[in-house]
Amino acid sequence: EPWLKDQKVGVIGSGEFQVSRHINVATVQTLASFLEEPPRDATPDKKSYHLKRRDLVKRFLSSVSLLILEEAHESSGSNFYDIARLCVNADYRLALTATPFMKDSTEANMRLMAVAGRIEIKVTEKYLIDRGILAKPYFLYHKVAYKPDEVRIKAELANKHLNFRVGMSTAYQKAYQLGIVYNLGRNEAIVREALLYKQHSLNCMTLVRLKRHGQILMEMMKESGLRVDFIYGESNQSTRQAKLNSLASGEIDVLIGSTILDVGVDVPSVGAVILAGGGKAEVEMRQRVGRGLRAKKNQANVCFITDFIDISNKYLLSHSYERKHIIDTTPGFAEGVLPIDGAFDFGVLKRD
């Protein structure tokens, strides 16, 4: 910002510990590591250094008068919460989050209330979409039944289940593993959607919950001729960024991502998102939809989002409609919901 041109900004994180008098930016991970107890096997000198630094950080936090919390819903985590509690003189607090008080845990929501207070300013999705700050989303749901991936199931799950049937009353864990991860019909539908997006020159992010599901989809997409890569929990930061850059530049058609992409990652603008992982958590759902809503430049400011209605099991079916209900009841999202098993109108790419 022009008015901050000559202002010194302190940085605490990424190997830096430079504190400024007025403005400082810090990562939760770095502050939390400084506030930990020193390792038991530390030498006396290292232990003394750690304790002095911890005392310095505590005094620094107590001096803060304005606390700005980015991704404030993460304050439900102990590190984030403990750091905020140490800012005892932060009478002014600005908490920024797209998912306030939406955790399944009452305790988690109360922690956010404790460190940030009630909602004072609410900016809706519709407000941002109508002004072009977010891309206009279109949602399409496909009903899918269970078609077992017999080859992979026999090779990988032979000793895990007595049978590989999925019915309406099948227990959730088994239903999810077979009906989502090892569901050949569902995975084939995901690949078809990715191919459709490629035909319309749309880069695509496919989001899963389990690493094995991402691996299976990557194998199937490569077999179909798609250029695809996969980011998961074990991927280091430089690897993640390189793969995200490949998606942004068009080097790959599809980037598959696990829950590592839900928060804290600078995701490039994408034209399409496939929600392949099921589930029902509202925070996760909104974060994943948000991966595709970054405003587009030099192209239509829209995003196509595919999800599935899993009809093979009562738990999967219930979760499907819970996800759909979130979209149906969100102004700005609801207007773009298409009939189940309908078709996208890719003509909007030219009209918009």
Language model: regions and residue ranges:
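Inter-Walker segment of RecA-like/P-loop motor cores
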Residues: 2-51, 243
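Conserved helicase ATPase core of P-loop NTP-dependent helicases/translocases
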Residues: 8-20, 36, 203-205, 215-262
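Structural recognition of the conserved hydrophobic beta-strand(s) that form the central parallel beta-sheet
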Residues: 24-27, 91-98, 254-257
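Conserved Walker B
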Residues: 28, 64-67, 71-73, 261, ...
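Post-DEXD/H (motif II) to motif III coupling segment of the RecA-like Helicase ATP-binding lobe
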Residues: 65-66, 71-141, 145, 327
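A short beta-strand element within the Helicase C-terminal
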Residues: 110, 254-257, 262-278, 284, ...
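Conserved interdomain hinge at the start of the Helicase C-terminal
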Residues: 159-222
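Conserved segment of the helicase C-terminal RecA-like domain
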Residues: 291-324
